[in-house]
Amino acid sequence: MSTAEAGGVFHRARGRTLDAFSSEKEREWKGPFYFIQGADPQFGLMKAWATGDCDNGGDEWEQEIRLAEQAVQAINKLNPKPKFFVLCGDLVHAMPGRPWRKEQTEDLQRVLRTVDSDIPLVLVSGNHDVGNVPTPETIAEFQRTWGDDYFSFWVGGVLFLVLNSQFLYDASRCPALKQEHDHWLDQQLRIAGQRACRHAVVFQHIPLFLQSIGEDDDYFNLTKSVRKEMADKFVEAGVKAVFSGHYHRNAGGTYRNLDMVVSSAIGCQLGTDTHGLRVVVVTAEKITHRYYSLDELSEKGIEDDLMDLLKEN
């Protein structure tokens, strides 16, 4: 499948917004809704991890295809339908310019094209999508393949911000792009800070932190100085939650009144969690979320206590 053919489904993020939702119509709170968060389908990592060669391995991804198909089938069965399905980065394992990247991307797009057309896809860039140290070229490639690397959109009075967390990790090879991203983010947070929205929610690949704001720097979190600066910005703007992936395990914590939610992977697990998805229910007062294994969500659907939240006025 060519990128052009895939464009309709995957290029919904354009001009720093998502064309699936009208910002005019969606500015008003209309009552509770829910969405699905997934992370790290990362086609190719399971083989690379098993062979101990994460840099050069990953020449097979049949397992990940099956898991992604199971995730899509589970989402398509849900009733009522989620407002959207967000994938928080590391869509494929092969880094920019590496072997198998094109094939992994085509296979993932083939699976994602089967998501119910009434459930928009929200695609977040991860380090494997734009590179650990992104460049203008790797960012441009992501945009050609998947749409904008950062953008905002409104759903039912809630402002959602999709960030490119690689700019927060290492922007040494694209400082001008980071500056544009930071300026845009400050503008968006001003809107949130004016309380023009019911809630504000952030999606990014790399977590601010895994358990607590003061934890040591690690491959799987942002550095202390960056995470504190970002977390304070979010708190002051009234952001309720940050949803991320990257860790391939479930984790998270709170800082002041900010919920940092780290979801395990659809694909390769690096801990004891199961391949799964997170159901996120947004009500007038709060955001409630629960991680489901793919088997649980496929077989049983969403539990009654979460469904009851959707009936609140």
Swiss-Prot record:
Similarity field: Belongs to the metallophosphoesterase superfamily. CPPED1 family.
Residues where a divalent metal cation 1 binds: 53, 90
Main location: cytoplasm
EC number(s) on file: 3.1.3.16
Superkingdom of origin organism: Eukaryota
GO cellular component annotations of the record: cytoplasm
GO molecular function: metal ion binding; protein serine/threonine phosphatase activity
Compartments it resides in: Cytoplasm
Key words of the record: Cytoplasm, Hydrolase, Metal-binding, Phosphoprotein
Gene that this sequence comes from: CPPED1
Phosphoserine modifications at: 2, 293
Stated name of the protein: Serine/threonine-protein phosphatase CPPED1
Organism: Bos taurus (Bovine)
Cofactor stoichiometry and binding remark: Binds 2 divalent metal cations.
Reactions it catalyzes: O-phospho-L-seryl-[protein] + H2O = L-seryl-[protein] + phosphate; O-phospho-L-threonyl-[protein] + H2O = L-threonyl-[protein] + phosphate
Region (Catalytic) residue spans: 47-250
Essential cofactor(s): a divalent metal cation
